[in-house]
Regions:
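Short linear motifs at secondary-structure transitions and domain/linker junctions
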Residues: 202-204, 283-285, 441-445
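P-loop NTPase catalytic cores that bind/hydrolyze ATP
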Residues: 217-221, 231-236, 312-313, 388, ...
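Short, highly charged low-complexity linear segments
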Residues: 136-143, 185, 282, 450-458
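Ferredoxin-type iron-sulfur electron-transfer modules and their immediate structural context
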Residues: 226, 230-385, 430-439
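Iron-sulfur-cluster electron-transfer modules
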Residues: 2-130, 134, 297-300, 306, ...
Length: 464
């Protein structure tokens, strides 16, 4: 252990980096908790198993093999390379050098794997960049993917390349330095050993390059960590709790408003006793209004969805409404929810929805009238909501179990129950149900007229 001024500087930088991230994470947590309460406790084993398969195991990614393979490389590389980050943190605080070298063959296996994965990450990032900027992948386009979202996707790729370059610079310079000094460097460096020829033979220059690579790598990681809350890549953290708290009941089953359900049952059966505690999974506290007009009307799990979105567009690419030219984009619903939260409550350090991306969604006059903004109409139009066929294709496609349909249904409920603003076709159906007991405009007495020319002659008996 050797303490120096450099260790003090490192400790201050590390504390500032992690502290700033914790501050941003707390702001995001506060945003999520403005949502309505929803009981998602219980079924721990089932939830853990789903998290293991979907979040850790990337199960739903492999429906599209090419991006799944590329993403797997970056994902595994991210996990393994972070083992070296632990070593850098220990070295930076205590003044040691490659403190985990005592692990011998295991350390060599780790550093060798680290290097190979680092090279593969660079190749995968290049492929991702081409898919976003060189090829035409339809799901990477759309009005919601202009300005900040498009820039953010590329910034992340550039940061990942810079981090890998810093890593190889540190390792290659350190390896050549030890070779010149006739010393053995713990570990295996299959990629860096190929790069040593690019480095000078000066011991002083190699010392400088090794330190530059070391500092660039760890400071870059801390900067990346604090960029995450402003980026779609925050999903690398939020995907795990989002999958854990995702709904377990069948996708086709909607959660009714309990208070309305109990009222209807009590009207039909005077002996019906309204239960006090909610019993169904996902049951919410009694609402002050029906449905959702703004983000605070949605459940906290819906707001957690918004921070878990990868903006990959898989949901929109399978949406039948979007595919037939309707305005609805499930991805936009989720992105709008996040933007509205950060407009109304807490914004992260870098991204502020008041500054980026709004030209694709609002005219200048709307931007000046932010106090009157709500999620419904301010960001999401009724036309988008009523285009939804409630088919659950978006939910099935999402690799991190986001459920845009829940938010859509809640905003529809507000339109119908609070504003009586359902489309005319639905209003006709509601009137028919009220007057005729069926969605169709036929008298109940005429309900069996279709059977007149069939073998059924005793319609009274058929209805008995």
């Amino acid at each position: 252990v050797h303490f120096s001024f450099q260790n003090i500087i490192f400790l201050l930088v590390a504390v500032a980096g992690f502290g700033l991230f914790a501050w941003q994470a707390q702001k995001i947590r506060a945003n999520i908790l403005v949502g309505r309460d929803r009981d998602m406790s219980g079924n721990v084993n089932e939830r853990l198993w789903k998290t293991l398969l979907v979040a850790f195991g990337q199960q739903k990614m492999f429906k599209r093999l090419t991006p799944a393979f590329l993403h797997l490389i970056v994902y595994v590389g991210f996990i393994v390379i972070n083992i070296e980050v632990i070593e850098i943190l220990i070295d930076g605080i205590f003044g040691t050098h490659r403190v985990l070298g005592f692990m011998g063959p295991l350390y060599s296996a780790l550093t060798g794997t680290n290097e190979v994965l680092g090279a593969l990450v660079v190749l995968a990032v290049a492929a991702f960049w081409w898919r976003r900027n060189g090829s035409v992948v339809r799901r990477f386009t759309g009005p919601e993917m202009r300005a900040w979202p498009r820039m953010d996707a590329n910034v992340i790729l550039y940061i990942e390349v810079i981090l890998m370059v810093a890593l190889f610079t540190m390792n290659a310079a350190d390896l050549k330095l030890h070779q010149l000094e006739g010393k053995a460097l713990p570990g295996a460096f299959p990629i860096s050993s190929l790069l040593t020829g690019l480095f000078p033979d000066s011991v002083t220059a190699l010392h400088v390059l090794e330190r530059v690579g070391w500092w660039a790598h760890i400071v870059g990681i801390l900067l990346f960590l604090n960029y995450l809350p402003s980026s779609k890549h925050f999903h690398i953290i939020m995907a795990f709790p989002n999958v854990y708290f995702s709904r377990l009941m069948p996708q086709g089953k909607f959660s009714n408003v309990d208070s309305i359900t109990h009222e209807v049952k009590a009207m039909m059966d005077p002996t019906y006793q309204v239960p006090t505690p909610p019993v169904s999974e996902g049951a919410e506290a009694a609402p002050t209004s029906f449905g959702a007009k703004d983000v605070n009307d949605l459940a906290w799990t819906n707001l957690l969805n918004a921070y878990s979105c990868t903006e990959c567009g898989r949901c929109t690419s399978v949406c039948p409404a979007n595919l037939t030219g309707k305005l609805l984009s499930p991805r936009k619903i989720i992105m709008d929810t996040r933007d509205r939260m950060e407009e109304k409550y807490n914004s992260p350090l870098i991204f502020n929805p008041n500054l980026y991306g709004k030209e694709a969604k609002h005219d200048p006059q709307e931007q000046l009238d932010k106090e009157n903004h709500t999620l419904l109409r301010g960001y999401v139009t009724p036309e988008e909501l009523w285009a939804c066929t409630t088919c659950n294709a978006c939910v099935e496609a999402c690799p991190v179990n986001i459920n845009p349909l829940e938010s859509i249904i809640e905003m529809r409920r507000f339109l119908v129950l609070e504003e009586s603003a359902a489309p005319n076709s639905l209003n006709v159906m509601f009137s028919n149900i009220e007057n005729n007991g069926a969605p169709w405009a036929f008298s109940p007495s005429d309900r069996f007229n279709w059977a007149d020319e069939l073998y059924v002659t005793d319609k009274a008996g058929a209805t008995a």
